[in-house]
Swiss-Prot record:
Keywords of the record: Phosphoprotein, SH2 domain
SUPFAM superfamilies with a match to the protein in the record: SH2 domain (SSF55550)
Record has Iron-sulfur as a keyword: no
Name under which the protein is recorded: SH2B adapter protein 3
Tissues and organs where the protein is expressed, per its UniProt entry: Preferentially expressed by lymphocytes in lymph node and spleen.
Lineage start: Eukaryota, Metazoa, Chordata, Craniata, Vertebrata
CDD domains per the UniProt record, alphabetical: SH2_SH2B3
PROSITE patterns: SH2
UniProt PTM: Tyrosine-phosphorylated upon T-cell activation. The tyrosine phosphorylation site is multifunctional and may associate with the SH2 domains of phospholipase C-gamma-1, GRB-2, and PI3-K upon T-cell receptor activation.
GO molecular function, one term: signaling receptor complex adaptor activity
Keyword set includes Phosphoprotein: yes
Modified residues (Phosphotyrosine): 356
Residues in SH2 domain copies: 119-217
Gene: Sh2b3
């Protein structure tokens, strides 16, 4: 009985979220713990430990009040090797955010690296991305687009046409815009695309899967109140583009396809377009409406600079006007086509399920 009574009065041990007071001289300046409350109401910063919890003995002082709190110095213990290093995790609630709801800033930190480019389609689905790159079948081998990943927030996917089939390659972007694709690292997504324009995409299946980026899908917002229409059936050739499109578009050679599915006009452009400024992310137009260096003087025999991967795309208003003019002239030839895939192509209309297929399986599919 006496033992039980003494057990009730033993000092209780509990964990303390604040390990060391701010005035502890043993704690290095670079490892100061975070305060439990910072700034005005609404800015709440909480910290907790994962792994070992440090005990805090609270003995009774005079008149039954809590006495001085003793907390062992975790820095000295970690240096001596008695305990494993601690990992401190912080949770930050911004003003207006409900407590307990974690914000996902991954997309917000990396979207601005891609949102200015015409080949970035944002949060479209895998099936929609596969449809866009499969529109021309095997003829659009190497056509690509970049989109946000559906299953992994903050990551991106390169969807491209491989011999008429849509394949998906995951991209990882850092907060500084650096890009990683499998074992390859690039300073930016632009450098990655330029690399895959010159070198095959690493699918590890030899020459049968040799694919280089040859064109990209451009999405232009459709004018409000207009119903989507098919602009061309078999694609716009270079001759028709020179006669039916404005001066800046007459310079395009080998335009693959121009359609308007869903709620937006979709244009597939090859890489032989005028230069696209990869750093500023917007086109440069001269006073005559033609890209700099691609006017009449450049067409008379001057040597053009090496081909670039990103090129001039006009403003959405100008491109919408040109597409509208092209619709009026080619609507008669588009009545007998609804762009439905045939039975052989319809089986490959969707993307490769919900999970990313291993590269070895992609190689086997390509060899079939």
């Amino acid at each position: 009985m006496a033992g039980r009574t003494q057990g009730k009065h033993r000092p209780r041990v509990r964990t303390c979220p604040s390990l060391v007071p701010f005035d502890n001289p043993c704690w290095p300046p670079s490892h100061q713990p975070l305060p439990l409350q910072v700034g005005a109401p609404g800015h709440r910063v909480t910290s907790f430990l994962s792994g070992r919890a440090w005990p805090s003995y609270i003995p009774k002082g005079k008149h039954g009040l809590p006495g001085p709190r003793y907390v062992p110095d975790p820095w000295s213990l970690g240096v001596l090797g008695h305990v494993a290093p601690l990992r401190v995790t912080t949770t930050i609630f911004l003003p207006g955010a409900s407590p307990g709801v974690m914000l996902d800033p991954a997309c917000q930190k990396t979207d601005h690296f891609l949102s200015c480019y015409p080949w970035f389609h944002g949060p479209i689905s895998r099936v929609r991305a596969a449809q866009l790159v499969q529109l021309q079948g095997p003829d659009a081998h190497g056509v690509f687009l970049v989109r946000q990943s559906e299953s992994r927030r903050g990551e991106y996917v390169l969807t491209f046409n491989l011999q008429g089939r849509a394949k998906h390659l995951r991209l990882v972007l850092t907060e500084r815009g650096q890009c990683r694709v499998q074992h390859l690292h690039f300073p930016s997504v632009v450098d990655m695309l330029r690399h895959f324009q010159r070198s095959p995409i690493p699918l590890e299946c030899g020459a049968a899967c040799d694919v280089r980026l040859s064109g990209y899908v451009v999405v232009v917002s459709q004018a409000p109140g207009r119903k989507p229409k098919v602009v061309s059936r078999g694609g716009v050739t270079a001759s028709t583009a020179r006669t039916k499109l404005p001066s800046w578009l007459r310079l395009l050679h080998g335009v693959i396809h121009v359609i308007s599915p869903g709620s937006s006009n979709t244009v597939l452009f090859p890489f032989s377009l005028p230069h696209w400024d990869s750093e500023l992310g917007h086109p440069h137009l001269s006073s005559a409406g033609c890209p700099p260096g691609h006017g009449a003087e450049a067409l008379r025999g001057q040597v053009t600079p090496p081909e670039q991967i990103f090129h001039l795309v006009p403003s959405p208003e100008e491109l919408a006007n040109s597409l509208r003019q092209l619709e009026l002239e080619s609507v008669s030839s588009a009545r007998d086509s609804d762009y439905e895939m045939d039975s052989s192509s319809r089986s490959h209309l969707r993307a490769i399920d919900n999970q990313y297929t291993p590269l070895s399986q992609l190689c086997r599919e390509a060899n079939l």
